[in-house]
Curated annotation (Swiss-Prot):
Entry protein name: Recombination protein RecR
Organism: Helicobacter acinonychis (strain Sheeba)
Family the entry assigns: Belongs to the RecR family.
Role: May play a role in DNA repair. It seems to be involved in an RecBC-independent recombinational process of DNA repair. It may act with RecF and RecO.
Keyword Metal-binding in record: yes
Gene: recR
InterPro entries from the UniProt entry: DNA_Rcmb_RecR, Rcmb_RecR, Rcmb_RecR_Znf, TOPRIM_dom, TOPRIM_RecR
């Protein structure tokens, strides 16, 4: 039995926690734990503080479901943004990615999960903000195509134009794995859904 490893419970627990982060394997987790625990403990303390602050202050916007540190996010409270377009995305991280492109100046709506979509509240928002177009910014998959059709069907009485970002985004690939030029081109070449 390896008693050396058994004597490093705290270190191995840190490795185990880091390994649970998406795209971090055992070797990377070990390197990070070693760096934080031995080579740069000041960074570890800053990271601990940043994590505590994020957990205390991060929430979702009550209007669009994007990440926010207040009840209404900065995008929803920005009166200079175009109200006629609403870009629907699957995850809050998609808002970050699309905002970095600086191609879209409208509003967002993050679905998170189709099971929890409050279509009544969404419809009230569409009317209140005078939305005329919903842009689906979903990665191209059969499931997402079905989701777009479902949403169109639920909102057909609202007399909206439904568009989706153009193909060119590879099927089955998440936004964070696509270069900004391809994503920007796909967004600006969106087509009627």
């Amino acid at each position: 039995m390896n008693t050396y490893k058994n004597s490093l419970n705290h270190f191995l627990n840190l490795v185990d926690c880091l390994e649970k982060i998406p795209n971090v394997g055992k070797k990377s987790a070990f390197k990070m734990a070693y760096h934080l625990g031995l080579e740069n403990p000041y960074l570890a303390l800053k990271l601990t503080h940043a994590l505590e602050n994020a957990l205390e202050n991060l929430k979702t916007c009550t209007s669009c479901n994007a990440l926010s540190e207040s009840e209404i996010c900065e995008i929803c409270s920005d009166e200079s943004r175009q109200n006629s377009q609403l870009c629907m995305v699957l995850h809050p991280r998609d808002v970050f990615i699309l905002e970095d492109l600086k191609d879209f100046l409208g509003r967002y709506h993050v679905l998170n999960s189709i099971e929890n979509v409050d279509f009544n509240a969404l419809e009230k928002r569409l009317i209140k903000e005078k939305i005329k177009e919903i842009i689906f910014a979903f990665p191209p998959t059969l499931a997402n195509d079905s989701l777009m059709l479902y949403i169109e069907d639920k909102l057909q009485h609202c007399h909206l134009t439904f568009t989706k970002i153009a193909q060119g985004v590879p099927a089955g690939v998440n936004f964070e794995n696509i270069d900004s030029v391809s994503l920007s081109r796909a967004f600006n070449s969106r087509i009627k859904a």
